[in-house]
Amino acid sequence: MQGMNGDGNEGLIVSVVVCTFNRSTLLDVCLESLAGQRTDGRLWEVVVVDNGSTDDTGGVAGRYAERQGNFRVAVEREIGLSRARNRGYRESAGGYVAYIDDDARARPDWVSVMIDFIRRNPGVAAFGGPDYGYALCHRPEWLPPEYMWTELDTAKGRERPIRFPGERYTGCNMVFRKDVLESFGGFDADLGMSGTGIGYGEETNLLLSMQRAGHTVWYLHDLKVDHLIQERKMSLRWNLRSFYENGRTYDRTVGRKYGLFMRILRLFGAAAAGMIQFVNPRAMPFKRRLYYSLRYPVSEIGACVTYVESLRNKGRFHTG
């Protein structure tokens, strides 16, 4: 394995992969945050994966590659975030592969925090950290204060093992040991975002598989990124679509063990909890009340629809 090897020698430790599709302006902000890292450039690199963009993504990435000696560009023409992420780790030269979204900004010590952790835990298979939402436009008052923040309880420790999916970090701030990532075949190309389409679950599916195989997943509270809340994600309509797709993803990853009866129970339970949430006397904007009351029922509907589709595909479900 390149990077940190068994005898403790150091080469290129981390390859930071940035997958991007038609977001050249946001990519510029992300890459600038990486260019400003306070870490020896001989220990890490940046691999920008252009996933078939038609805007100025190639130009932006190319300018950073010319300016920064440890930046380079790869291309994945088959659309899909999982495919781009897989291209990224295959192109990487480091012993560890870190992923950050193209609409996220790394804190100045982001790379140094992960390298320090790897040095202290040379066999660690996977870890990630919190992300904090920020907006460039007016943030609607109805959005929950915790919206697009992913931060785990530090009372249990700032560095600690976690169990997916009960505790989790998001795909915009995660690190894998490359040989472990390769041994699982990378990310499932049938899961995740595809172009402008909403999709989730590729990192959850992978991390669950790693856990089942005996690998430990860690949370590092000091490994921080800021994640842009895009304007389109500040509408209730977009969030309802997101809840639905999350449910579909849940069924294809975590929820595979449930039969039809248990799924119906979960749906009714979510609906009942949603009604209780809606009539909660606590004062809040109407749209926020809808957000809280609909997120789990809509997600369970997505899971049930996906389950029925799978039965139809197997010829085990008939409507007539």
Q: How would you label these PLM feature ranges?
A:
Residues 169, 193-208:
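Acidic donor-binding loop at a coil-to-helix junction in glycosyltransferase catalytic cores
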Residues 97:
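Short aromatic/hydrophobic "clamp" motif used to bind/position activated sugar donors
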Residues 129-130, 146-167:
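Short, flexible, basic/aromatic active-site loop/helix in glycosyltransferases
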Residues 33, 50-59, 104:
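A conserved acidic beta->alpha catalytic loop
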Residues 76-92:
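Glycine-rich, basic loop-to-helix element that forms the pyrophosphate-binding segment
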Residues 241-248, 255-320:
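Non-catalytic, C-terminal membrane-associated alpha-helical segments of glycosyltransferases
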